[in-house]
Amino acid sequence: MAVRRLFWRVLVAGIPRRGVSVLIFSHRSFRILVGCALALAACEQPRTQVAVQSDDFGDPVRIGQPPTRIVSLNPVTTEMLFAFGAGSRLVGRSQFDLWPDSARLIPDLGNGLQPNVEIVLGAHPDLVILYASQDNRPAAARFRAAGVSTLSLRTDHIADFRRTVQMLGAILRDSARARAVSDSVFRTLGRVRAATTNLPRPTVFWHIWDAPLITIGAGSFMTELVDIAGGKNVYADITGPSATVSLEDVARRDPDFILAGPQGVQKISEDRRWRIVRAVREGKVLKVDTVLVGRPGVRLGEAAVSLANLLHPGTLH
């Protein structure tokens, strides 16, 4: 549980600490994404329709009218809401919801795990969106008991992104825009996969945290991103999303490249113990923007392009 909570804080929340840096995506690219979605969203579902969904806790979600006061304590869904053009409906966010820049203007209601229920209810939301962690089950129950619609979601795999987008689209009565956003992301992912399919597939170790040393497993969408980008995760045999490993085992698995955030790259370069890994000795430690590639949201396509160009320079532009 401790490793899983740390994994949330580093990858989903994107704490700028020890191997993690925060990069704010350009407003121009964000406007292009939203503009494409608007152009394709030609119709909406009737606003009187009641949305009946089951969230990732298996709890029912019933909303009679599109929500107008949303608290999103899940950075992935906050980004999606802005892509839907629904950012103005947000009345609360987690402290880690920093993209796009306009998200910073929304009141910060905590870190997104075990939220203060009274503070959140003080924002008078008609919908609360949580990260579907066991830590958040009690809060979800309390929000429902208070009569507030609550949606708990997690996106462990790329396929979960499409489902999450579709669910938000149904709740907002804007399924056409949801399809537009989803299709745009998957077109980009398809383009990256097509460009890397016939290329050599270097092996990769993804450095997430150093004390303890944490990496990603097959259960993480980031392993899927590595595959799409033309690489292979040396810990793809681990079924979970993350795992604690030893430096000696990393050396035995002998990755061609190491991926790490800016401070992680610095840590590896300064710690002589890492010299037992061939990729370190050969200078093949690659710096990634952990927030961009660590959130399975509307920038998944951008993340895949970034990784492909790291592993196969010049492949995509």
Predicted regions and their residues:
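Bacterial N-terminal signal peptides that target proteins for export
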Residues: V3-L33
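Bacterial signal peptide processing site
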Residues: E44-P46
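His/Asp/Glu-enriched short active-site or ligand-binding loop at hydrolase and phosphoryl-transfer sites
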Residues: S94, A218-S242, L286-K287
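Extracytoplasmic substrate-binding proteins
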Residues: V50, P60, D126-L127, R137-I214, ...
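A short, structured surface patch at a secondary-structure boundary
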Residues: R69-A123, L127-Q134, A139, V234
